[in-house]
Amino acid sequence: MSTDILRKIEAYKREEIAAAKARLALDELKARTRDQSAPRGFLKALEAKRAAGQFALIAEIKKASPSKGLIRPDFDPPALAKAYEEGGAACLSVLTDTPSFQGAPEFLTAARQACSLPALRKDFLFDPYQVYEARSWGADCILIIMASVDDDLAKELEDTAFALGMDALIEVHDEAEMERALKLSSRLLGVNNRNLRSFEVNLAVSERLAKMAPSDRLLVGESGIFTHEDCLRLEKSGIGTFLIGESLMRQHDVAAATRALLTGAEKL
């Protein structure tokens, strides 16, 4: 996403946040988070797959995107969550942004309730209020996009997530962002292979940035991963965890496609 697009997204997000705060005071929202069952352990689920010698997949539930338009016409979050779990995914990522991705909070809640997988709120966060929102909807993890926040806000979002028992996936797409991300506490680092200015996708981005990460960090490859061969290529750089959405969302048999991606097994 170009800087201009990120600016537009931030503008409408700040309007959304102001409207949400007017509807529901922070104290009331915090009370709702206390009504939720405990977080399921997002990072823990990924590490368990890797420890078992398997690829760890964060499988994304995404109806549409700004660049591709409608991706999945027959969009059924609970059915997709069950299919991903059956196919061997470790975690879910659910889009909750409406203007750009046709996402919704209820998609996250419904998907998580339909399976036993931990779920990420995939959205653009600019205020700790949104972290409390995410937890109140059932999310186990938040996304912090370094391209869209400064260091102070990134730390504030991360601290809020940790205080709620959640994990934080820190997303970077270049060396400068990786250096900033490494100052945070989260061990979960996502490398977006999509150039945020040109939209080009290149797995070499993950291969390059992986060299900067200490061994205690869990690296997640994002964007441009379509096949088992892509997974094997990134594994050579120490990346065995992936966030994949569009390529699986377009498949008729999502469970079989997920299994094929993770294991190399032929789709039935």
UniProtKB/Swiss-Prot annotation:
One Gene Ontology term from the biological process aspect of the record: L-tryptophan biosynthetic process
Enzyme Commission (EC) number: 4.1.1.48
Reactions catalysed according to its record: 1-(2-carboxyphenylamino)-1-deoxy-D-ribulose 5-phosphate + H(+) = (1S,2R)-1-C-(indol-3-yl)glycerol 3-phosphate + CO2 + H2O
Name of the top EC class for this enzyme: lyase
Annotated pathway: Amino-acid biosynthesis; L-tryptophan biosynthesis; L-tryptophan from chorismate: step 4/5
Superkingdom of the organism of origin: Bacteria
SUPFAM superfamilies assigned: Ribulose-phoshate binding barrel
Annotated keywords: Amino-acid biosynthesis, Aromatic amino acid biosynthesis, Decarboxylase, Lyase, Tryptophan biosynthesis
A GO MF term: phosphoribosylanthranilate isomerase activity
Protein's UniProt keywords contain Metal-binding: no
Family: Belongs to the TrpC family.
Protein name as annotated: Indole-3-glycerol phosphate synthase
UniProt source species: Brucella abortus (strain 2308)
Upper classification of the organism: Bacteria, Pseudomonadati, Pseudomonadota, Alphaproteobacteria, Hyphomicrobiales
